[in-house]
Amino acid sequence: MKKSGLLNPDLCYAIARLGHTDTWAVADCGLPIPEHVEIIDLALVFGIPTFEQVLNALKPEVVVEGAVIAEGTPERIREMVDTDVEVVTHEELKAQLAECAFVIRTGETTAYANVIFKSGVAF
């Protein structure tokens, strides 16, 4: 058993496969995700886990060099993203999901609590 960090095996595997510039997303529980995109579903019930809880668990595990959010994303979600952010329409964000390596579905119920991240490099 792992001593620390992420425990979800699907999430650990998905992160380990990421390369520089690959995209992936953290989403609220209502975001429509394209059928061909891998979903790592962490949602238990409405509100658990929150977007913030999931993002805080991910931050020590991944290198991020950019992010995409939709117009209307709440300021508290924007503030959690510690990188350069591109703002697009909600429809454009949903279209970009088709290119993501995976989407992590949270139990978050805040509208527009969705962020696409661009993987960076650790060296």
From Swiss-Prot:
Residues at the active site: H20 (proton donor)
Reaction catalysis annotation: beta-D-ribopyranose = beta-D-ribofuranose
Residues annotated as binding substrate: D28, H90, Y112, A113, N114
Keywords assigned: Carbohydrate metabolism, Cytoplasm, Isomerase
EC number: 5.4.99.62
Enzyme class, first EC level, given as a word: isomerase
An annotated Gene Ontology molecular function: D-ribose pyranase activity
Gene Ontology cellular component annotations, sorted alphabetically: cytosol
Pathway(s) annotated for this protein in UniProt: Carbohydrate metabolism; D-ribose degradation; D-ribose 5-phosphate from beta-D-ribopyranose: step 1/2
GO terms of biological process kind: D-ribose catabolic process
SUPFAM superfamilies found in the cross-reference section: RbsD-like
Localization in the cell: Cytoplasm
Disulfide bonds: none
PANTHER family, sorted: D-RIBOSE PYRANASE (PTHR37831:SF1)
Subunit structure: Homodecamer.
Sequence similarity: Belongs to the RbsD / FucU family. RbsD subfamily.
Functional note: Catalyzes the interconversion of beta-pyran and beta-furan forms of D-ribose.
Name under which the protein is recorded: D-ribose pyranase
Naturally occurring in which organism (per UniProt): Corynebacterium glutamicum (strain R)
Recorded name of the encoding gene: rbsD
